[in-house]
Amino acid sequence: MLDGMLIALARMEPEERLEQVARFVPRMDNWAVCDTFCTSLKFCKKHPALVWEFIQPYLTSARVYDVRFAVVMMLAHFITEDYVEQVLALLDGVRHEDYYVGMAVAWAVSVCYVKFPALTLEYLRNSSLSDFTYNRALQKIIESLRVSREDKSLMRSMKRR
């Protein structure tokens, strides 16, 4: 965890930071380190195209925390008007069956819904998410304090049985 914080906070060029990130990601072995690391990488805001390109290969890795890293990076830095459609398309393509990957995808979908409800609702109606991930995403939306009572009722009606 300390190594991750140093990578996030030390002064360095973005390319050097991404080299350090690439060395650190394989050492992640739990969701807390992964999520804290991803959310602490504030340089992403200044270099979105570079970071976006960097995280793409991690989405198809066989390693749990490689995939979670990419998903949490998208959720922390790319649920924006410029990237949300691409984020949803990529989330729909995540096929790793691990619990921690599914939960990260569900979390990301719920944040998409909070920020872009109409777009995410359309996505949910047509997504190919696993039943587990889809229902977890709905549950996270229902639990959100930033979603209306009416939208929560709609989410309850959309659950897959």
Language model features: what each stretch is:
Residues 1-161:
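Alpha-helical scaffold domains
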